[in-house]
Each structure stands twice: as structure tokens, then as C-alpha cells.
UniProtKB/Swiss-Prot annotation:
HAMAP family: RibP_PPkinase_B (MF_00583_B). Belongs to the ribose-phosphate pyrophosphokinase family. This is Ribose-phosphate pyrophosphokinase 2, chloroplastic. Binds 1 Mg(2+) ion per subunit. The lineage of its organism: Eukaryota, Viridiplantae, Streptophyta, Embryophyta, Tracheophyta. It comes from the Eukaryota. GO terms for cellular component: chloroplast; cytoplasm; ribose phosphate diphosphokinase complex. One of its GO terms (molecular function) is ATP binding. It comes from Oryza sativa subsp. japonica (Rice). Residues 1-32 form a transit peptide. It catalyses: D-ribose 5-phosphate + ATP = 5-phospho-alpha-D-ribose 1-diphosphate + AMP + H(+). Its cofactor is Mg(2+). Its EC number is 2.7.6.1.
Length: 399
């Protein structure tokens, strides 16, 4: 790990701060937030007139950096992908939810991002037309179903149908963040299981395969009647942490009992670090209460691991408890930055040394703050797509 850290420390995107100095005061720095270099154009047709509406924030003259791992072995694999990736049967299209990620994935594979026209009519209906042939092609549709969830999900359904009617050989939906994944069971009577419904609708629309990243509950993978490849964002976060000088006094913390398996796997890969658990009781939707700590964090650097950060109530309450129990510094690591209000206020309040997320969800500028670091998962998704396209093993990517 030391050799890897030395090799990666020269990257201009790597923070100069070290985990071995947790007591250092929080310094203001430019947030490493994802912003698209290209805008997603959504056309609204109203009374015969065409108006333009931008689906993402305006790009800035100097977009903040997104840290991408540069391990030599990984670079060799990606070089092979770029060399062999000029396969006319491989087509990658993007919806409006996260075009910058889709563009980066296509660039890694050495292919052009597919041309597609996506329009919104005056009454809100969605129109999709593919601008190139997909007959006999393996089509991959990149679309996280993040906020606005229903809008992005419906747009994905329409894109799937357009590809199916255009005689695509296979249709794989790439969903970096799977909305409704938390509605995976009936907690009370007369409730819907929306995760299962979403899986059914994706199948009925015409999907042949699904690629998802760090779905909230792995049992939801069984809701699909088609093949599902479940990939993990942990390697991206672990590579970033490996680029820093890791303190020996390190502890991985699960912010709730439900995330223990995830945190234990993370701790094992992080030099077999000790594990601590925050026990809490949830009082209602988007509300939680931290009860007590299981484990020792006194004088240690705490790395909190979760699959997503929504309102940040759970993770900030847990971080406050860790501070009370004597943790020198607290880092938050999560694959999905949902960031529903009041998450930004909670996360930027100074309790976290750093908040580390991936670009599975496109973050607008108003959701960026000084402690935020965004890591790119494009290379991980690109390798997965290539293995699926070539009928290779996806699990081998994570070994």
C-alpha cells in the first residue's frame, strides 16, 4: 500500500492533507465536485415554438477536479479497452440524469457517446428519438434514477422502448444509483414494494440486463427476472484512501447496524482495520436517533462507510457521537451523494474532516462544499460494460 500511495501521491488531484494529521483544523479548499463539460440539451415544444432548457447546471470556466485512480495495472487494462473498444456493435447512450459520467465512460472505451434526441413537451411528456442506427447492436443506457426520480425513471423506460423498437440486439440499462431501492419490503401493512415494481417495469419495457452500483439492499437484486450485475464503488474509494498516508490509529465505523457487512468488508480491505458500530433507532422516514457506540474510537481516525448519504441525519448524528467518544477526526465515505435537504448544512458544518463520494449522481454547484471530494467511477463502469459486451466475467474486476 505504501508503494501505491507513493505512486499516486504525485497526482494533481490528490489532496495534500494526510490522514495521519487528523487534528489539523479544517481548511477551506475548492470542492471536488462533478460538473459537466457538456450540457444535456432538453427541448421543450410549446405551441409550435421551440425553447431550450438546460438539464444540468451551467458549466464553469474552471470545473473542479474529479479524482480518478491511476493504478498501473488498471491503466494497462484501460489501454487495452481503448485499443479494442472500437466495436461498431457497442453503443452507449445517456439520458439527461448524468451525461458527464456517460461521456467519461464512452471515452474510456474509445467509442463515441450515442446521439439521442430527448424532448419535453409542454405538458411534461417525454419524447426520445435515437439519432443513429442500433440494429443488431449491444446497447448500454446510462441513467441513474436519482432526483427527480420519477422523471428520470420514465425517461429510461422511453429510451429502452426506443431501442427495442429500433431492433437492438440487446439492451443493458446501467443504473449507477437505483432509486426506490430502499422500498424493498413491507415495513407496515398495505405498503407497496416499489423496488420490486421498478424491477418489473424495467423488464417489461424491454431490458435484457441491468448493471447497478451499490444497491441499498442486495436482496433487491432478486426482484429482477433478468440478469443483474452488481458492482461496487468501494475500490474507487479505497484507491483514493491508499493515495494518502493512512494513520495506524484507524477505525472503520458503520453508522447503523444494517451496514455492518459493508463496513466489515471495507475494513478488511483497508489493512484489516478495526470495526466500530453505531446503534440507532429510526423514529420515522428521514429521521433517526443515535443510541450508543459499539467499539473503541478514542484517539483514532474514524472512517464512516455507507452506501448513500441522503439527508445526512444518520451519518452526522453518528459523527457527533464519535467525537464525543474521543475520535480525533471523522471521514465520511459513501458511493451515492443523494444530498436531500438539509444534507449540505449538516455535512458542511465542520464535524467532518472530509466527505468522500463518487459521481454516480451528478452534483449541481449548489450542492458542493469545501469538505467534499468526488471520485470518478467511470473506469469501473467502463470495464464492467466491456466485460458484459465481450461475455467476460464481471466478478473478476473486483478480485
Amino acid at each position: 500500500m505504501a508503494a501505491k500511495a507513493a505512486a499516486l501521491s504525485s497526482s494533481p488531484f490528490v489532496s495534500s492533507r494526510r490522514l495521519s494529521s487528523p487534528a489539523a483544523s479544517l481548511r477551506a479548499r475548492t470542492p471536488r465536485c462533478v460538473m459537466g463539460s457538456e450540457q444535456v440539451r432538453v427541448v421543450v415544444e410549446e405551441e409550435g415554438k421551440t425553447k431550450k432548457r438546460m438539464g444540468v447546471a451551467e458549466p464553469r470556466s474552471a470545473p473542479p477536479a474529479v479524482w480518478t485512480p491511476r493504478a498501473p495495472a488498471q491503466e494497462a487494462r484501460l489501454a487495452a479497452l481503448r485499443t479494442d473498444g472500437r466495436d461498431s456493435r457497442l453503443k452507449i447512450f445517456s439520458g439527461t440524469a448524468n451525461r458527464p459520467l456517460a461521456q467519461e465512460i464512452a471515452s474510456y472505451l474509445g467509442v463515441d457517446l450515442g446521439k439521442v434526441l430527448i424532448k419535453r413537451f409542454a405538458d411534461g411528456e417525454i419524447y426520445v428519438q435515437l439519432q443513429e442506427s442500433v440494429r443488431g447492436c449491444d446497447v448500454f443506457l446510462v441513467q441513474p434514477t436519482c432526483s427527480p426520480v420519477n422523471e428520470n425513471l420514465m425517461e429510461l423506460f422511453v429510451m429502452i422502448d426506443a431501442c427495442r423498437r429500433a431492433s437492438a440486439r440487446s439492451i443493458t440499462v446501467v443504473i449507477p444509483y437505483f432509486g426506490y431501492a430502499r422500498a424493498d419490503r413491507k415495513a407496515q401493512g398495505r405498503e407497496a414494494i416499489t423496488a420490486k415494481l421498478s424491477a418489473n417495469l424495467l423488464t417489461e419495457a424491454g431490458s435484457d440486463r441491468v448493471i447497478v452500483c451499490d444497491i441499498h439492499s442486495t436482496q433487491a437484486l432478486g426482484y429482477f427476472d433478468i440478469p443483474v450485475d452488481h458492482i461496487h464503488g468501494q475500490p474507487v474509494i479505497l484507491d483514493y484512501l491508499a493515495s494518502k498516508t493512512i494513520s495506524k490509529d484507524l477505525v472503520v465505523v458503520s453508522p447503523d447496524v444494517g451496514g455492518v457487512v459493508r463496513a466489515r468488508a471495507f475494513a478488511k480491505k483497508l489493512s484489516d482495520a478495526p470495526l466500530a458500530i453505531v446503534d440507532k433507532r429510526r423514529q420515522g422516514h428521514n429521521m433517526s436517533e443515535v443510541m450508543h457506540l459499539i467499539g473503541d474510537v478514542k484517539g483514532k481516525v474514524a472512517i464512516m462507510v455507507d452506501d448513500m448519504i441522503d439527508t445526512a441525519g444518520t451519518i452526522t448524528s453518528a459523527a457527533a457521537l464519535l467525537k464525543q467518544e474521543g475520535a480525533e477526526a471523522v471521514y465520511a465515505c459513501s458511493t451515492h451523494a443523494v444530498f436531500s435537504p438539509p444534507a449540505i448544512e449538516r455535512l458542511s458544518g465542520g464535524i467532518f474532516e472530509e466527505v468522500i463520494v463518487t459521481n454516480s449522481i451528478l452534483l449541481p454547484e449548489h450542492k458542493c462544499f469545501p469538505q467534499l471530494t468526488v471520485l470518478s467511477m467511470a473506469n469501473l463502469v467502463a470495464e464492467t460494460i466491456w466485460h458484459v459486451h465481450r461475455d467476460g466475467s464481471v466478478s473478476s474486476i473486483f478480485q
